[in-house]
Amino acid sequence: MWLLLAVFLLTLAYLFWPKTKHSGAKYPRSLPSLPLVGSLPFLPRRGQQHKNFFKLQEKYGPIYSFRLGSKTTVMIGHHQLAREVLLKKGKEFSGRPKVATLDILSDNQKGIAFADHGAHWQLHRKLALNAFALFKDGNLKLEKIINQEANVLCDFLATQHGEAIDLSEPLSLAVTNIISFICFNFSFKNEDPALKAIQNVNDGILEVLSKEVLLDIFPVLKIFPSKAMEKMKGYVQTRNELLNEILEKCQENFSSDSITNLLHILIQAKVNADNNNAGPDQDSKLLSSRHMLATIGDIFGAGVETTTSVIKWIVAYLLHHPSLKKRIQDDIDQIIGFNRTPAISDRNRLVLLEATIREVLRIRPVAPTLIPHKAVIDSSIGDLTIDKGTDVVVNLWALHHSEKEWQHPDLFMPERFLDPTGTQLISPSLSYLPFGAGPRSCVGEMLARQELFLFMSRLLQRFNLEIPDDGKLPSLEGHASLVLQIKPFKVKIEVRQAWKEAQAEGSTP
C-alpha cells in the first residue's frame, strides 16, 4: 500500500510541479505558484473573474501568467497583444486546451468551437462557412429568414399589449428557429416539446459552465464522482438524441440535387468522401454522425444564447436610457416609416441604432473572456516567450474597458461610435473585438449582426418598450458563463399608437 501511495504522490509531483523553462528565455510575469495547486490560492475568489483578471493588470501588466494545476495560462489584456495572438499569429495560437466539461460538451473536442487545431476542426469550420454562404441570395436569403421570425415574434408581442413580460422565451424561440432553418430548413412551433427540450439543454449546459469545476483544473480528480460531469453528460445526451433524430430523417430524404442547409452540406461531404470524390482534407472518418452532431450542437449552442442575450442587454440599456430609445424611434419613423419593414440596407442610415448595438457589444461583451486558445508551437507574444501547449486567454472585458482606449469606459455612450456630426458610424478604437478575430473568430458573426439590427429595428418600430408598473429597472451587472448573461427582468410591451394609426390607414378601402 505504501508503495502505491508513493507512486501516486510521485506521479502528482511530476504532473503538477512547474516544468523547467527554456534557458535565457523571457516569460510573462507570473502570479505566485505552489506545487499541486499552482496559483489557485493567489487568484481572487470573489466577484466576476473577467473583472478580477482585469484588476490584476494593475500589478502584473497587460500580459501575465498563472498556473492552474499543471497548466500555465497567459492572460492578455491589451488590444495589440490580442491582435498578435488572434490575427498576426492566429495559426500558432489556434489550438484549444483539453477541459473536462468542454470535452464532454464537444464529444472529446469534435465540432468547431472547442475542437483542437487539426484537420477535423479546419474541415468543419470550412463546411459551416459554406453553409452560411447558402443564405446570401434568393429564397434562402438570411435577411428573409430573420424577418420571418421577427414577424412571428412581433405578432406574439402584440398580443401582450399592456403586459410586463420576460422576453427570454419568445426571443429564444425566434432565434432558435433561425438557427434551425440554417441547420435543417425547418422551424419549431411554440408548443413543440423538442423546442422546450433544446432550450432546457442550453440553459443546463450554461449553468454547469458558469460554475467552477475542480475537475477542469485537476484532471486527476476524474477518478472521483462529479455531479457537474454527470449533469453535463445528461444534457449532452439529451441534445444528441434530439439532433440525431433530425439527422437520421435528413439522411433518409437526402438528395445531392437539393443542398439547402448545413446538415445537407455535412452529409454531402460525407458522401463525397465515401465515394473518393473529395479533396484530401475530407477524410470520411472526420464526417461521422458524432462529428456532425458536435458541429450542429456548436451552432445551436453558440447561435441561440449569444444573440438572445445581446438583444436582452440592448433592451435593458434602453430601459435605463429612455431618451435614447425615443431618438432611435424618431429615426425609424423618419427614415423607415410604418409602411415597410426595416432592411439590412438601412443599417448605415439608422446610425444611432447601430451605434447603440455596437456600444452594448462593447460594454457587455458576449464573451467577457474569449474561449482559451493554445499555442500549437513554441512562439512568442511581443518579446515574451510562449511555450508550446500554453493556454492563452484574451480578456475581452479588459480590451473593452481600458481607460487608455475608451473615454469613461464604464459609461454607456453609443455616440462614441459616431462622428462629431452624429451621421456617420466610426471605429473609435482598435481595442474592440466583440466577435474575436482570426482563424478562431465567430463563424456566425454576419448572422448575429443582422439579427441584432433587424430584431431591434422591428421591435422599436412597432412597440414602446417600457419599465413595468412596479418601476423595477433591470440589473446591469450580469452573470458570466461562456456568455455574459443578464439577470432575468421584465419589460412592459405597448403597441405604438403611431403604428396602430398607420395600420388602420393601410386597411382603409
From Swiss-Prot:
EC category: oxidoreductase
Compartment annotation:
Endoplasmic reticulum membrane; Microsome membrane
Q: Answer yes or no on keyword Hydrolase.
A: no
What SUPFAM superfamilies does the record tag this protein with? Cytochrome P450
Q: What Gene Ontology cellular-component terms does the record carry?
A: endoplasmic reticulum membrane
Q: Could you tell me the keywords of this UniProt record? A: Endoplasmic reticulum, Heme, Iron, Lipid metabolism, Lyase, Membrane, Metal-binding, Microsome, Monooxygenase, Oxidoreductase, Steroidogenesis
Q: Which cysteines are joined by disulfide bonds?
A: none
Which GO molecular-function terms appear in the entry?
heme binding; iron ion binding; lyase activity; steroid 17-alpha-monooxygenase activity
Q: Where is substrate bound in this sequence?
A: N202
Q: Pfam families this protein is in?
A: p450 (PF00067)
Return the EC number.
1.14.14.19, 1.14.14.32
The coenzyme or cofactor needed here is: heme
**Ways its activity is controlled:** Regulated predominantly by intracellular cAMP levels. The 17,20-lyase activity is stimulated by cytochrome b5, which acts as an allosteric effector increasing the Vmax of the lyase activity.
A GO BP term, please? hormone biosynthetic process
Q: Identify the pathway.
A: Steroid hormone biosynthesis; Steroid biosynthesis; glucocorticoid biosynthesis
Task: Give the reaction(s) catalysed.
Answer: a C21-steroid + reduced [NADPH--hemoprotein reductase] + O2 = a 17alpha-hydroxy-C21-steroid + oxidized [NADPH--hemoprotein reductase] + H2O + H(+); progesterone + reduced [NADPH--hemoprotein reductase] + O2 = 17alpha-hydroxyprogesterone + oxidized [NADPH--hemoprotein reductase] + H2O + H(+); pregnenolone + reduced [NADPH--hemoprotein reductase] + O2 = 17alpha-hydroxypregnenolone + oxidized [NADPH--hemoprotein reductase] + H2O + H(+); 17alpha-hydroxyprogesterone + reduced [NADPH--hemoprotein reductase] + O2 = androst-4-ene-3,17-dione + acetate + oxidized [NADPH--hemoprotein reductase] + H2O + 2 H(+)
Q: Which domain of life is it from?
A: Eukaryota
Ligand binding (heme): C442
Functional description taken from the UniProt entry: A cytochrome P450 monooxygenase involved in corticoid and androgen biosynthesis. Catalyzes 17-alpha hydroxylation of C21 steroids, which is common for both pathways. A second oxidative step, required only for androgen synthesis, involves an acyl-carbon cleavage. The 17-alpha hydroxy intermediates, as part of adrenal glucocorticoids biosynthesis pathway, are precursors of cortisol.
Identify the PANTHER family for this entry: STEROID 17-ALPHA-HYDROXYLASE/17,20 LYASE (PTHR24289), STEROID 17-ALPHA-HYDROXYLASE_17,20 LYASE (PTHR24289:SF13)
Family, according to the entry, reads as follows: Belongs to the cytochrome P450 family.
The molecule here is called Steroid 17-alpha-hydroxylase/17,20 lyase
